[in-house]
Amino acid sequence: MSTLQAVKYIRGKLEVLDQLRLPHEFHYDEVSNRTEAFDSIYTMRVRGAPAIAIVAALGLAVELHNGSCTASSAEETIGQIEEALDYLKESRPTAVDLTNAINQLKARIREVGSTATKEAIISAFIEEAEKIFEKDLKTNLSIGDFGAEWLRAQVGASPEQQISVLTHCNTGSLATSGHGTALGIIRTLQAKKLLHHAFCTETRPYNQGSRLTAFELVFEGIPSTLITDSMAASLFRTRKQEKNIAAVIVGADRVVRNGDTANKIGTYQLAVLAKHHGVKFIVAAPTTSIDLETETGDGIKIEERKKEELTQVTGAVIKPDGTVDESSKVRVATADQRINVWNPAFDVTPAEFIDAVVTEKGAIEKGPDGKFDFSQILPERWAKITGA
């Protein structure tokens, strides 16, 4: 198990790793209230759908634990907490884990009821937030196991016939409570001696692949190679047979009812390339990332980011001798600052390009009708939404 932690928590204190400083600096920010949690998420100092939900929940839990609630009645307490949760929801609207966590927390404090004491409501909220944190690690370990077994069955991965994979963005310990989703499958493949090599994209424009995934892979000694986003087609065409490249494994910020998947920008093009080159395309996501209320990807709200993320970049200074000065950072322009920029943070991969959605409850494949059916793994939610 990796010792990398995006989030450090004990009751009353939350520390969040500032991932904008990686890989050159390891620094934790203390998050003590909803405003700091919102800012940490919005500025992408923390990212990854599970980690975002965890930071939002625990950030407010710390604030409440430390006595910020000014309500004088149970009803007012519930109202203040729900107002704070609605505020946090806007920090990253595409990530359905955040919405699901907020709904779960609201349901819990309402369950305690308006007749309970203020202290009982706050205590129930804190305990529920901690459950979200604790459950995520178990979920990720299960995703890793199911993903590795699916690849063993579908592409013949074995210690004698190891496979190589490509991943996009960052979906490891830095995006979750630990182990990871897509990168968790890669970790499990490595542990079971099924992995030959892992390729990771740099993931422009925020470079989560080069800054974070490459960092995690090197940290754990997993054989790996970094490529630019635009090299994927050439990689499949020239190295697929030599390296036995069998799958692209990505995470998800939202998987909707028909299987359409919102993930980091650049995911869709990888899915198209994988299909063309006969490479399996796998989405790894907890069931909390599955949004049954939204029928297709057309209903997903896509966040757009500021233009400077494309036209400027920050990095550590390289000394004349070629070594990295980790204490010295510089921000430079990479384009004419007057150019117009379109910068969506996510894209939507249609279900037709996805071979499997791997969750903590198993790997789901499309049925004979070419559609994903999540009713078997989410029967209660499915029945509630569809009436079936």
Swiss-Prot record:
GO MF annotation terms: S-methyl-5-thioribose-1-phosphate isomerase activity
GO BP terms, alphabetized: L-methionine salvage from methylthioadenosine
GO CC annotations, alphabetized: cytoplasm; nucleus
Catalytic reaction list: 5-(methylsulfanyl)-alpha-D-ribose 1-phosphate = 5-(methylsulfanyl)-D-ribulose 1-phosphate
Active site: D253 (proton donor)
Cellular location(s): Cytoplasm; Nucleus
SUPFAM superfamilies: NagB/RpiA/CoA transferase-like (SSF100950)
Transition state stabilizer (site feature) positions: C169
Main location: cytoplasm
Enzyme class: isomerase
InterPro entries associated with the record: IF-2B-related, IF-M1Pi, IF_2B-like_C, Initiation_fac_2B_a/b/d, M1Pi_N, NagB/RpiA_transferase-like
HAMAP family cross-referenced by the UniProt entry: Salvage_MtnA
Protein's job: Catalyzes the interconversion of methylthioribose-1-phosphate (MTR-1-P) into methylthioribulose-1-phosphate (MTRu-1-P).
Protein name: Methylthioribose-1-phosphate isomerase
Protein's organism: Fusarium vanettenii (strain ATCC MYA-4622 / CBS 123669 / FGSC 9596 / NRRL 45880 / 77-13-4) (Fusarium solani subsp. pisi)
